Design a protein with these regions (language model features):
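Ala/Thr-enriched low-complexity intrinsically disordered regions
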Residues: 3, 17-18
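A short glycine-rich, aromatic-capped structural motif
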Residues: 39-114, 134-135, 209
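Functional-site microenvironments in short loops/helix caps that host divalent-cation chemistry
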Residues: 47, 53, 57-68, 111-262, ...
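Solvent-exposed residues in well-ordered beta-strands and their adjoining turns
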Residues: 24, 87, 278-280
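N-terminal secretory signal peptides that target proteins for export/translocation
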Residues: 1-12
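Bacterial Sec-dependent signal peptides at the C-terminal "C-region" and cleavage site
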Residues: 27-38
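Bacterial N-terminal signal peptides
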Residues: 18-28
């Protein structure tokens, strides 16, 4: 279960048509749009072309989800394990921060703010924390405004696991304290540089903790997956990775593998969900 941070989604009214029109204007006059330093070359990581292992064939033989009252079994929506070839691409080294998102809002003049910001300002001393409580649409718009996109599931997973398909950035076994996740984590967002050991084989940071991340893709079965899952379809978008949690089954070690897959309505927003961007150039 995701950590919700709002009482009613309907309190936050969206007007994406006007927003996209605004962004279209900004794209047409790029000379007048200052670029955040988040988009300097050294802030994105080149993931080289090549094969990687995606998904898993693992099965939870103990039915852990039933013991804790969860609906979805572990791992099954990530079957089957397979090798995939991807061309090279770039991905943000860090999650998009409050300060970076604030700059985007100033440039776009979009007035729909993250729910926990007060008077248009992010919480004090949290400029370098990942921005949260943004919908998929807002995350997508941010990336688009900078000539990028949200990473696909494939891009996200390759960046997280490397060519060897590791379950954790540092290796095969979960090690407490290496990422902001679980009962020993901070149970709140932390600066994107706070956990230097949460570094993927490509040195992409924070993919296994701090916040879960929106991806570009709909929640669909992988090729070859025959599971009958009623939530599959073009209704929910995919969240990847783990984030801080305050309670619940996410404290269990079985739920901590770094490439975990979750689904959410693209109109919803959460206190432990953020995003990063990717690019082919």
């Amino acid at each position: 279960m995701l950590a919700w941070s709002f009482s009613q989604v309907s309190n936050k009214i969206k007007n994406y048509t006007a927003f996209i029109l605004c962004l279209s204007f900004l794209w047409g006059c790029c000379d007048c749009v200052p670029q955040s330093k988040a988009y300097e070359a050294d802030q994105m990581i080149l993931v080289p072309a090549g094969e990687f292992i995606m998904g898993t064939n693992k099965i939870d033989t103990e039915d852990t989800h039933k013991k804790i009252g969860a609906v979805k079994p572990l791992y099954l929506d990530q079957h089957p394990e397979r090798k995939i070839f991807l061309d090279e691409y770039y991905i943000d080294q860090y999650e998009v921060t409050n300060a970076e998102y604030s700059h985007f809002l100033e440039v776009s003049q979009f007035t729909d703010l993250p729910a926990h910001w007060q008077d248009g300002v992010f919480p004090k001393e949290q400029g370098d924390h990942p921005v949260t409580q943004v919908t998929w649409w807002e995350a997508w718009s941010y990336c688009q405004s900078n000539g990028k996109q949200l990473p696909t599931e494939e891009q996200w997973e390759k960046a997280a696991r490397g060519p060897a398909g590791l379950p954790f950035p540092w290796g095969e076994k979960y090690i407490k304290g290496k990422a902001n996740v679980g009962i020993e984590g901070d149970r709140k967002t932390m600066p994107v540089t706070a956990y230097p050991e949460d570094a993927s084989p490509y040195k992409v940071m924070g993919l296994s903790g701090n916040v879960m991340e929106w991806t570009l893709d709909w929640y669909l079965p992988y090729p070859g997956n025959t599971r009958k899952e009623f939530r599959f379809g073009k209704v929910f978008k995919v969240l990847r990775g783990n984030g801080f949690q305050k309670a619940g089954h996410y404290f269990l070690e079985a739920y901590r593998y770094s490439f975990s897959r979750t689904e959410a309505n693209p109109n919803d927003f959460f206190e432990n969900v953020g995003f990063r961007c990717s690019s082919k150039y």
